[in-house]
UniProtKB/Swiss-Prot annotation:
It comes from Campylobacter jejuni subsp. doylei (strain ATCC BAA-1458 / RM4099 / 269.97). This is Enolase. Pathway: Carbohydrate degradation; glycolysis; pyruvate from D-glyceraldehyde 3-phosphate: step 4/5. It catalyses: (2R)-2-phosphoglycerate = phosphoenolpyruvate + H2O. The keyword Magnesium applies. Binds a second Mg(2+) ion via substrate during catalysis. Mg(2+) binds at D239, E280, D307. GO terms for biological process: glycolytic process. Its EC number is 4.2.1.11. The active site is at E204 (proton donor), K332 (proton acceptor). Gene3D superfamilies: Enolase-like C-terminal domain, Enolase-like, N-terminal domain.
């Protein structure tokens, strides 16, 4: 075995200029792993706690408490542990925190250490991270769900839906799929500029124009897909993030108040008109009856993804499976706090034929851990923003590297 010999953390910046935690783990052979923890803007209420300082520094968003928890509390407990026993490490982190949502240490502290330790162990074996975490069966390049028009909490515009994505499923390689997205993205920029719209970018690298309603972005994407020559090879996916505009039992958007039934019918109409393959968080995280109805209505036709609904939590997902809510789960490691817990949620989903989508957060960094993680777990899909901004392209570029070693692209088999 190789023992964990040193652990340290410090404050760095994410893509929004907010502080986040960077952790480094050193093993007894000198191998080092490092990781930067992401941060979300629209968050589910049941997510693991992201510990912030709430003082005068950085408008209260500093993470020195989480950093201190790594350096002072966590380090002393995990030094000497077997670096190759990820489960033991992560279970130790959970026990040390003592809460279900990491409200003592902070999930930004525990996840940083968990990720960094996995990287150090992979480095010690001379293995790529995806192979170390996934073993011999880690081979499938995921279909990217590329968010090229931003709205909601990710943009300063008047569009309610949070993400308008394109999914290049009709290709035999990841690099060709990515090329199609690049070409569509370039055409979209020209279309927006020519029509007098802003080409400013949102948090995730997509364009963030003011548009008439939540349908106009879809029309724009369809125009660009057609001009690029990729009809029937690229579909549309939406992240509605409806919890953000759910209040007093109604969904408030486009200057109207919609019931769950109204919104479901809106989705049915959209799916009949456009090649929509996936809707994420179509209803609010606590609108359970609505979710059951939505799944009954569209669950056999498209992918219905639970993000705020499930928050990458194995126990919550299990309840959702029993109640037949959604048919897919978004996977965000920082929602749950460790690598092991993330893997358990993915395995539960896969055993029950729920699809998985590995996902970034809107506050990201140059760390490309989730690219390897998506391949390791054969999630088959990944969300990591538009093809702009370095914190987004870092993940795409890492997947292009992985494709040189493992060239199976899920594509039409999705």
């Amino acid at each position: 075995m190789l023992a964990i010999e040193d652990v340290r953390a410090y404050e760095v910046l994410d893509s929004r200029g907010n502080p986040t935690v960077k952790a480094e783990v050193t093993l007894s052979d000198g191998s080092v792993g490092a990781a930067i923890v992401p941060s979300g803007a629209s968050t589910g209420s049941k997510e693991a706690l992201e510990l912030r300082d709430k003082d005068e520094r950085f408008g209260g968003k500093g993470v020195l408490k989480a950093v201190a928890n790594v350096n002072e509390s966590i380090a002393g407990e995990i030094l000497g542990l077997d670096a190759f026993n990820q489960t033991q490490l992560d279970d130790t982190l959970r026990e040390l925190d003592g809460t279900k949502n990491y409200s003592n240490l902070g999930a930004n502290a525990t996840l940083g250490v968990s990720m960094a330790a996995a990287r150090a162990a992979a480095a010690a074996l001379g293995m790529p991270l995806y192979r170390y975490l996934g073993g011999a069966n880690a081979s499938i390049l995921p279909v990217p769900m590329c968010n090229i028009i931003n709205g909601g909490a990710h943009a300063n515009n008047n569009v309610d839906f949070q993400e308008f994505m394109i999914t290049p499923f009709g290709f035999t390689s990841f690099k060709e799929a990515l090329r199609s997205v690049c070409e569509i993205y370039a055409i979209l920029k020209k279309e927006l500029a020519n029509s007098g719209h802003s080409t400013a970018l949102g948090d995730e690298g997509g364009f963030a124009p003011n548009l008439a309603n939540n349908t106009e972005p879809i029309d724009l994407l369809m125009t660009c897909i057609k001009k690029a020559g990729y009809e029937n090879r690229v579909k549309i996916a939406l992240d509605v993030a409806s919890t953000e505009f759910f209040k007093d039992g109604k969904y408030h958007m486009e200057d109207k108040a919609f019931s769950s039934e109204d919104l479901i019918e809106r989705y049915v109409e959209l799916c009949a008109k456009y090649p929509i393959c996936s809707i994420e968080d179509g209803l609010a995280e606590n609108d359970f009856e609505g979710w059951i109805k939505l799944t009954e209505k569209l669950g056999n036709k498209i992918q219905l993804v639970g993000d705020d609904l499930f928050v990458t939590n194995e126990d919550i997902l299990r309840e959702g499976i029993i109640k037949k809510m959604a048919n897919a789960v978004l996977i965000k490691p920082n929602q749950i706090g460790t690598i092991t817990q993330t893997m358990r949620t993915v395995r539960l989903a896969q055993r029950n034929n729920y699809k998985c989508v590995m996902s970034h957060r809107s506050g990201e960094s140059e760390d490309a851990f989730i690219a390897d993680f998506a391949v390791a777990l054969n999630t088959g899909q990944i969300k990591t923003g538009a093809l702009a901004r370095g914190e987004r392209t870092a993940k795409y570029n890492r997947l292009l590297e992985i494709e040189l070693e493992s060239d199976e692209y899920l594509g039409e088999k999705l």
